[in-house]
Amino acid sequence: MINGSIVALITPMNSDGTVDYASLERLVEFHIEQGTDAIVAVGTTGESATLPMTEHAAVVCQTVKFASGRIPVIGGNGANATAEAIELTKSMQKSGVVAMLGVTPYYNKPTPKGLIAHYTAVAASTDIPQILYNVPGRTAVDMKPETVAELSSVSNIIGVKEATGDLSRVARLRELCGEDFLLYSGDDATAREFLLLGGNGVISVANNIVPHAFKAMCDAALAKNAQLAETIDQPLTGIYRSLFCEANPIPVKWAVHRMGLIANGHIRLPLTELSEQFHGLLIETMKQAHIEVK
């Protein structure tokens, strides 16, 4: 399965709010050229919460077509209603995605029993591998390692994206879930340590703007070359911080636009474009990371 540097891809949009497929194709080509190991289409960073189901599935399917077998694509299939998650999963069944990434149901705060029932039902609706996604800072529910361990026995649940930033969970998840269960970091600031502790990869926001360097860091960490990984990672720490000066994906979408990779930085309400007070911060950290700003 997929190890290494995985981009949580933004979804570019036209000024009228429709999806900008020309820019999306450009982004896919950019990540192929930069050596990114895989793409997550329409996850949190891809504005999944504001894409209706048919549009969500269409963006995932088109991303796979643009990739044309040259880079694996993982499709986001999270929803806070199990029936909706199943419907979304079925709509991508023949898309060509190599796996699906499903965030814990948000807002309604399911119990561990509810999480197990939810993910088991979604997994049963498809033969495509499923990756769990724990990000309590956004969902208000924390899926503990013990719950993940129970779900790891489901044949097509193959891994988890753990975005708490709690590095103690790496060893605990590995102990409970076994060596074959895939552990992905969802926190750029602690990703290097996550990999050195035994993680398999990183599903990254920063990878949208520093893919070559982020890939090099991941490769070094996976090879257990801690010194090289730190040397590559250190200049990126400012980027990691500045990309969360406002809610993701507001800053990263603005940054990708300033790189000239997408036609404009339109983002769907209730999110709004990056506040002017943060423009200077982001430009400065991008320049420090040797990113060309246009």
From Swiss-Prot:
Q: Which reaction does it catalyse?
A: L-aspartate 4-semialdehyde + pyruvate = (2S,4S)-4-hydroxy-2,3,4,5-tetrahydrodipicolinate + H2O + H(+)
Cite the binding residues for pyruvate: 45, 203
InterPro entries in the cross-refs: Aldolase_TIM (IPR013785), DapA (IPR005263), DapA-like (IPR002220), Schiff_base-form_aldolases_AS (IPR020625), Schiff_base-form_aldolases_CS (IPR020624)
Which SUPFAM superfamilies does the UniProt entry name for this protein?
A: Aldolase (SSF51569)
The biological processes this protein is annotated with in GO are: diaminopimelate biosynthetic process; lysine biosynthetic process via diaminopimelate
- Tell me which Pfam families the record gives: DHDPS
What Enzyme Commission number(s) does the record list for this chain?
A: 4.3.3.7
- Where it mainly occurs, coarsely classed, is cytoplasm
Q: Enzyme class, one word?
A: lyase
Record localization? Cytoplasm
Site positions (Part of a proton relay during catalysis) are 44, 107
Which GO CC annotations does the UniProt entry carry? cytosol
Q: Which UniProt keywords apply?
A: Amino-acid biosynthesis, Cytoplasm, Diaminopimelate biosynthesis, Lyase, Lysine biosynthesis, Schiff base
Q: In which pathway does it act?
A: Amino-acid biosynthesis; L-lysine biosynthesis via DAP pathway; (S)-tetrahydrodipicolinate from L-aspartate: step 3/4
Q: Which HAMAP family match?
A: DapA
Per the entry, what this protein does is:
Catalyzes the condensation of (S)-aspartate-beta-semialdehyde [(S)-ASA] and pyruvate to 4-hydroxy-tetrahydrodipicolinate (HTPA).
What name does this protein carry?
A: 4-hydroxy-tetrahydrodipicolinate synthase
